[in-house]
C-alpha cells in the first residue's frame, strides 16, 4: 500500500485550453477517494494521468515516495478496473485472473496462491473453471476486480466500473466494493458520474466541474456545506433548491424577482441590498400554518413511496419540498412552507461561491 500525491497537476492538449486546471491532492495510505462529476468534467482524464495513460502538462505525481510522472503504467504499481470488463472470452476465470501474472514471469505456485486468495475474497471459487459467457454481469466485474487484486498494487484505479450493471446489481456491487476495501485497505481512486456511488463509497469526494476540483471533502461536508452553486446543484437528489434574489436593506428578508419575500429569522444586515442565491435542501423545508409560512401553489406531487415531492414556484423559480409519505396534498392546493434559518445556504450569484454569515 502507498499514499498518492498530485502536485500542481494540469492538462492541456493544445497548450492553450486547460482540460485539467491546477489540482493538488494528497490521498492517504489506504484511503478511498471518489471523483464525481458530469461527462466532460475531466475526471477520467485525471485518472488516466495517474495511471500513466495520459501525460501531465505540468506538475508531478507521486505514489508512495516515488515520483511516477514519467514512468510507464506497468512501472507505477497500479491496477485498473474499467467500465468494460475486458475479459478474454476463450479463457476461464482462473486464466483471466492469472494472465497478467504469467506474462510478468511469476511462477505457477505463486500464481495459484494469488488467484486462490483473490477468488476467496471475491467468492469466485466455484466459478474458476467457467468462461466469461457463462457468468452474469456482476460476476464478470468481480473477475475484473480479481485480476487487479492478484497484482497486489500500491493503488487501485476504478474507471466507472459499475456503469454497465443494472440498478439492482449496482447496489449489490457497491456493498461488495465497500467490503473489499475494508479487507484490503488499498489506496483507491474511483471515478463515477453517479453521485450515489460517490456518497456511499467515498471516504472523501472530489467534485469535478470543467476541469476544476470544485470541492474536496467528506461526503457529509460536500452535502451539508457545498462550496459552490455547482456542488449544491450537483450533489443531492433532488438537488438543492436555489433561488436568486436580493437581501433587503435591513437584512431581514430575501426578495425574489416578483417581489415575494422570504423572511430571514436571523437578519443579515451586512448583505443589505446585495444580489445573492439562497439555497435550501427539499428535506429541510417544513409545512406550517398560513401565519408562519410562505404560500406555494402546488403544481404537481411526485409519489415516491417512502416520501413525496411537492413541486411549485416561488418568484417564477422552481421549488421542491420533500414531504412524508402520509402527506398527499392535491395539485392546485396551497402549501405554507417554513425555511428553518439553520438550513439556509447563501452563495454569491456572480462568482457562484459559498458565503458565510
Swiss-Prot record:
It holds the Pfam family ABC_tran. Gene3D superfamilies: 2.40.50.100, Nucleic acid-binding proteins, P-loop containing nucleotide triphosphate hydrolases. It is found in: Cell inner membrane. It catalyses: sn-glycerol 3-phosphate(out) + ATP + H2O = sn-glycerol 3-phosphate(in) + ADP + phosphate + H(+). It is a peripheral membrane protein. Its EC number is 7.6.2.10. Keywords: ATP-binding, Cell inner membrane, Cell membrane, Membrane, Nucleotide-binding, Sugar transport, Translocase, Transport. GO terms for molecular function: ABC-type glycerol-3-phosphate transporter activity; ATP binding; ATP hydrolysis activity. Residues 4-235 form the ABC transporter domain. ATP binds at residues 37-44. Transmembrane segments: none annotated. GO terms for cellular component: ATP-binding cassette (ABC) transporter complex, substrate-binding subunit-containing. PROSITE patterns: ABC_TRANSPORTER_1, ABC_TRANSPORTER_2, UGPC. GO terms for biological process: carbohydrate transport; glycerol-3-phosphate transmembrane transport; glycerophosphodiester transmembrane transport. Belongs to the ABC transporter superfamily. sn-glycerol-3-phosphate importer (TC 3.A.1.1.3) family. PANTHER family: MALTODEXTRIN IMPORT ATP-BINDING PROTEIN MSMX, SN-GLYCEROL-3-PHOSPHATE IMPORT ATP-BINDING PROTEIN UGPC. Part of the ABC transporter complex UgpBAEC involved in sn-glycerol-3-phosphate (G3P) import. Responsible for energy coupling to the transport system. The complex is composed of two ATP-binding proteins (UgpC), two transmembrane proteins (UgpA and UgpE) and a solute-binding protein (UgpB). This is sn-glycerol-3-phosphate import ATP-binding protein UgpC.
Amino acid at each position: 500500500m502507498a499514499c498518492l500525491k498530485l502536485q500542481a497537476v494540469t492538462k492541456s492538449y493544445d497548450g492553450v485550453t486547460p482540460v485539467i486546471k491546477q489540482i493538488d491532492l494528497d490521498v492517504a495510505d489506504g484511503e478511498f477517494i471518489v471523483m464525481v462529476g458530469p461527462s466532460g468534467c475531466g475526471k477520467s482524464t485525471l485518472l488516466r494521468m495517474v495511471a500513466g495513460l495520459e501525460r501531465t502538462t505540468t506538475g508531478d505525481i507521486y505514489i508512495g515516495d516515488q515520483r511516477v510522472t514519467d514512468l510507464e503504467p506497468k512501472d507505477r504499481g497500479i491496477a485498473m478496473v474499467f467500465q468494460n470488463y475486458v475479459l478474454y472470452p476463450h479463457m476461464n476465470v482462473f486464466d483471466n485472473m492469472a494472465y497478467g501474472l504469467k506474462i510478468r514471469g511469476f511462477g505457477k505456485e505463486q500464481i495459484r496462491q494469488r488467484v486462490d486468495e483473490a477468488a476467496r475474497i471475491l467468492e469466485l471459487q466455484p466459478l474458476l473453471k467457467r468462461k466469461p459467457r457463462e457468468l452474469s454481469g456482476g460476476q464478470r466485474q468481480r473477475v475484473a476486480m480479481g485480476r487487479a487484486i492478484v497484482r497486489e498494487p500500491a493503488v487501485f484505479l476504478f474507471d466507472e466500473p459499475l456503469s454497465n450493471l443494472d440498478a439492482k446489481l449496482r447496489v449489490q456491487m457497491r456493498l461488495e466494493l465497500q467490503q473489499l476495501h475494508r479487507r484490503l485497505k488499498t489506496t483507491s481512486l474511483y471515478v463515477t458520474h453517479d453521485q450515489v456511488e460517490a456518497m456511499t463509497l467515498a471516504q472523501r469526494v472530489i467534485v469535478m466541474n470543467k476541469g476544476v476540483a470544485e470541492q474536496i471533502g467528506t461526503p457529509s461536508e460536500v452535502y451539508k456545506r457545498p462550496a459552490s452553486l455547482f456542488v449544491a446543484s450537483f450533489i443531492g437528489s433532488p438537488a438543492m433548491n436555489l433561488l436568486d434574489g436580493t437581501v433587503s436593506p435591513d437584512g431581514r428578508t430575501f426578495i425574489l424577482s416578483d417581489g415575494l419575500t422570504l423572511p430571514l429569522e436571523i437578519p443579515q444586515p451586512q448583505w443589505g441590498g446585495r444580489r445573492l442565491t439562497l439555497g435550501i435542501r427539499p428535506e429541510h423545508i417544513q409545512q406550517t400554518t398560513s401565519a408562519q409560512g410562505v404560500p406555494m401553489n402546488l403544481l404537481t406531487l411526485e409519489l415516491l413511496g417512502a416520501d413525496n415531492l411537492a413541486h411549485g414556484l416561488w418568484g417564477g423559480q422552481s421549488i421542491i419540498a420533500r414531504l412524508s409519505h402520509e402527506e398527499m396534498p392535491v395539485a392546485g392546493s396551497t402549501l405554507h412552507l417554513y425555511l428553518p434559518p439553520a438550513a439556509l445556504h447563501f452563495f454569491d450569484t456572480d462568482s457562484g461561491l459559498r458565503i458565510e454569515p
